[in-house]
């Protein structure tokens, strides 16, 4: 194991806390067959990033993470305690080792990031972001801010982390979010995936749902779609009562728009 990797896996140290010798943990035995494997829904965005998925909430930002600016370019730690933007990666590739951090939740809003060199990201008085802190204080804490499917990292001084377009250095100089402040924190942790079991015909509003089922079952000899012109409130009521499919079938049969209805 390299010095970089060895440093990256150490625990969070708060300022004023004494260092304790780590104790070896016994490996937990895998309970094979104790739980069924969950069905996986493919996250196309994660596939393009080597399996690293984008955090949607602050709770997602924990453990092994990367910080992406732009498309497949990640914040990279350097051995002088500074950060730069790494070179763009090919589709399907994940971040390099120097582009991988460990995130430690401070509370339900803020996190601290430790580089692979074992130092915490800190906002300096001049706006530079450095990685030279041995422990976490206020200046080492960052708040992920989410708005309209975009994210930015807010420092203790009220400035957002960004990449300087002049030299690709990591800074936090602006109190408003622009294109250079928008980023994504990505994780490669395993996660529970919500399986989409809704039939494709039932996506959209009830008017679209009815059209979808007509397309699926209608006899198209004359190439004309026959839609029941009665108010869709009938469908809303049927959905609330759990009889949507029966009502849709009845409406199609009245229009002779179902090849299975006589």
UniProtKB/Swiss-Prot annotation:
Primary location class: nucleus
Domain of life: Eukaryota
Skewed-composition ranges (Basic and acidic residues): 28-39
Cystine connections: none
UniProt GO cellular component terms: Cajal body; catalytic step 2 spliceosome; cytoplasm; nucleolus; striated muscle dense body; Z disc
Compartment(s) of residence: Nucleus, Cajal body; Nucleus, Nucleolus; Cytoplasm; Cytoplasm, Myofibril, Sarcomere, Z line
InterPro entries reported for this sequence: Actin-crosslinking, FRG1
Phenotype upon gene inactivation: Increased trimethylation of 'Lys-20' of histone H4.
Motif residue range(s): Nuclear localization signal: 23-39
Location of region: Disordered: 16-39
Entry keyword annotation includes Nucleus: yes
A single MF term (Gene Ontology): actin filament binding
Chain span(s) of sequence motif Bipartite nuclear localization signal: 239-255
Pfam families the record matches: FRG1 (PF06229)
GO biological process: heterochromatin organization; muscle organ development; rRNA processing
UniProtKB keywords: Cytoplasm, Myogenesis, Nucleus, Ribosome biogenesis, rRNA processing
Similarity section: Belongs to the FRG1 family.
Function: May have a role in processing of pre-rRNA or in the assembly of rRNA into ribosomal subunits. May be involved in epigenetic regulation of muscle differentiation through regulation of the activity of the histone-lysine N-methyltransferase Suv4-20.
Protein known as: Protein FRG1 homolog
Native species: Drosophila melanogaster
Gene: FRG1
